[in-house]
């Protein structure tokens, strides 16, 4: 059985969203698919908790790419209930496009802290068209889980043309030709020497990060 909680008000829907809602209403047969509204009474909330704990998978399609700020009720409480069920090991949570409570552009989260009852924590996020910045920027990245991109027929080159401020996520394949594997008979003088001038004895963090980065990138001596 599938429980579908419809949290919005139909009068607030766009024409397209209203058509999808009517299709869903036609599919709901009260046996295998049951449509429900947002919990109101204590009994409703208790029933939601029981249904979450009895479910194998929870699909989060509450909010999408337009979220910013903080979650409002009843979404904030519903997200908290889903997170509690997931923390108990009862369910696998899959987010649609973006986990609820995560800004798709910046990775900012509801209430500004992933440790508070703000955003939803997904085990997996299926995002559409292209990867969103908020899925790879923290703290939003901590909410996304495993990320899958489904193009749903959107041509990648066209999306890049339409994007006013495109971004590119560096892949291992991008640096494969730059960072060349070492030869078995190479030595520390074979791959160049790097001198680092940075930091101070009281603030050595920048020097450490630069040195680690140079060594990991293949420098022979740092």
Identify the function of each model-found stretch.
Residues 1-161:
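Glycine-rich phosphate/dinucleotide-binding loop and adjoining beta-alpha-beta core of small-molecule
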Residues 1-18, 124, 135-222:
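Small-residue (G/A/S/T)-rich helix-start motifs and N-terminal tracts that mark the onset
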